[in-house]
UniProtKB/Swiss-Prot annotation:
Pfam families: Forkhead, FOXP-CC. Residues 380-384 are annotated as: CTBP1-binding. The lineage of its organism: Eukaryota, Metazoa, Chordata, Craniata, Vertebrata. The gene is FOXP1. GO terms for cellular component: nucleus. Residues 346-367 are annotated as: Leucine-zipper. A zinc finger (C2H2-type) spans 304-329. This is Forkhead box protein P1. Keywords: DNA-binding, Isopeptide bond, Metal-binding, Nucleus, Phosphoprotein, Repressor, Transcription, Transcription regulation, Ubl conjugation, Zinc, Zinc-finger.
Amino acid sequence: MMQESGTETKSNGSAIQNGSSGGNHLLECGSLREGRSNGETPAVDVGTADLAHVQQQQQALQVARQLLLQQQQQQQVSGLKSPKRNDKQPALQVPVSVAMMTPQVITPQQMQQILQQQVLSPQQLQVLLQQQQALMLQQQQLQEFYKKQQEQLQLQLLQQHAGKQPKEQQQVATQQLAFQQQLLQMQQLQQQHLLSLQRQGLLTIQPGQPALPLQPLTQGMIPTELQQLWKEVTSAHTTEETTGNNHSSLDLTTTCVSSSAPSKTSLIMNPHASTNGQLSVHTPKRESLSHEEHPHSHPLYGHGVCKWPGCEAVCEDFQSFLKHLNSEHALDDRSTAQCRVQMQVVQQLELQLAKDKERLQAMMTHLHVKSTEPKTAPQPLNLVSSVTLSKSASEASPQSLPHTPTTPTAPITPATQGPSVITTTSMHTVGPIRRRYSDKYNVPISSDIAQNQEFYKNAEVRPPFTYASLIRQAILESPEKQLTLNEIYNWFTRMFAYFRRNAATWKNAVRHNLSLHKCFVRVENVKGAVWTVDEVEFQKRRPQKISGNPSLIKNMQTSHAYCTPLNAALQASMAENSIPLYTTASMGNPTLGNLASAIREELNGAMEHTNSNESDSSPGRSPLQAVHPVHVKEEPLDPEEAEGPLSLVTTANHSPDFDHDRDYEDEPVNEDME
C-alpha cells in the first residue's frame, strides 16, 4: 500500500509538471516578463497596473503550488506513520492538471508556422477573443474553487486524523470525485479549444512540449501579447487599428497603425515580409503571393535600392537588402515614427484622391448636361430634319459615341435651287485638338493675356493662340511696333512659361510663320532686320468676314461654338440615307463638284490659295453656311486635304478645330523650311 501511495504521488507530481492542456496566460505573462527583464531589453513598456496584476496572479499560483507540495509531503509522512490509512489516500488525492498551473508557451518558431498556415480575418479574431475570454473566466473561477477545495480538504484531513465517522469520509470522497470531474471538464474544454485551433491551422504544438527559453521578441510574439492584441480588437472601432501591434505588441492604436495583415507571412514572425508594419495600408484582403514563393519581390525593395521612406540605401542583392532591413529598420522609435508619417501621407493622398474624383465627376456631369442643351436657330428654308439626323446617327453606330450626346443645330441653305445640305452635329471629336478659343469665341488675345498673365508666366500650359496671333501681339506691344527675331523670342519666353522649354521646336515654328505669312513684313533699318505687322493683310487671313443680316450673324456665331466635324459613323448613316454632298462617292463625283463650285460662286465665297495660308496655323474653316447675300471668306484646305472639291461649306470630312489648331511644331515636315 505504501508503494502504491508513493507511485500515485509521483504520478501526480509528474502530471503537475508535464500536463499540457491550455495555458494560464496570466502566469505566462508574469514568467515571460521576468525573463524579458532578466534577459533582453523589452521592446515596449508595460503599464505598472498590468505588471502588478500579473505579479499578484503569479504569487497566488506559486502559493497554490507550495500548498500542493506540502500536502503531498504530509500525506507521504502520514502514510509512513499510519499504514492503515494508506488504502484511503488515493481517494483523497487531488490530481491537478498542468493546464491550471503550468503555462503553455508558444515559441516564435511555432507562431511563425501558425501564421504561415493561415491568417485570421477580423471576424475570426473576434470569435477567438470571445472564446479566450470565456476560458480565462472559467479558469479563474476554477482556480478559486480549487483553492477553497484545498482548504476544505486540509480541514477534512485534520478531522480524519482525529478519528471521524466513515460517513464524513464518504462525503469527502464524493466532493473529491465532483472536483475531479470539474477538473476533467475544464481539461476537455481546453483540449477542444486547442483542437479547434489545430483544425483552423493556427496551432501545431504537441502535448507535453517543454517551453523553450525566451528569445528576442522584436520579431516574435508570445501568447500573452496575442491575448492583449485580441483585447484591443474588441475595444477598437476597427480591426485595422491593432494589426500593426503584432511585432512585439507595440501600442500604435492611438495613431491607427494598420497594415500588417494583408499577406500570409506578413503579420508578425516573418521579418522578410512584415517590415515593421510597413505594408500596404488599409488593405484587408489577402495576397496569394508570399515572399517565400517569390524571394526577390518585396514592396520595400526595387532596382537594388531600399524603398524605405528617406533611406534609398543601395543593396547589391536581396539578401543584403534583408540584412539592411533587419539592421537599419528594426522595431524602434525611429522606424515607428516613420511608419506613422507614411500612414499620414497615405491618408492625405487618399483624401485628396477622393476630392479629385468628386471634382472630376462634377465636371463631367456639368459638361454632359451643358452639351445636351439645344441651341435655337431660325427655321431653314430647306433642310433635313435634325431629328432624323440624330436618329440616323444613333442607329448607324450606337456604340461609337457612348458618352457624347448629339445636339443638332438648324442648318442654313441657300435660296437658290440646289441640293439640300445639312450642318454637322455637336459631338465631341477625338484626337489631338487644341482649341483656339480666342479666335472662335471672339476673345481678344490682348485681353486674355492681360487677365491670365500670371497664370501663363508660372504654369507650363500651352497658350490657346496661334503662333501668328502671338507674334502679332508681341509686335503690337512693342513701343515702336516692330521687333527683331531675338526680341520676339524673348517676348515668348517672358510671357509664357510653356516656351521656356523645347526652344528649338517653337522657335522654328516662329520663323516659319514670319517667313510664310504676308501679314508679317521684314524691314531693314539701322538696327538690322525687324518685323512689323500689316494689319490689313492680317485681317484678310482671318477665318471669316461675315456681313449682312445682324440676326443671322449672331445665330451663326452662336452655332459656331457648338459645331464639330461628323465622325465616320455619322457619315455612313448619311450615305445610307442618300444625303448629297456628304458621302465619299459624291465628293469624288465631278458633276457634284461642279455643282458645289457653282453654289460657292453664288454665295460669293472667296477662297484664298496662297502659300501663306497653306502653312497658316490660324483658325480653320467654319462649317456654317451663309444665306445670300452674306459674304463668307474662308481659308483653303491644307495640301494633304485638298483632294476633293469643297461642299457648300468646305468639305464633308473637314475638321475646323483640327486644322485651326495645327501648329508648326506638330508638322516636322515643314521645320526644315526657313
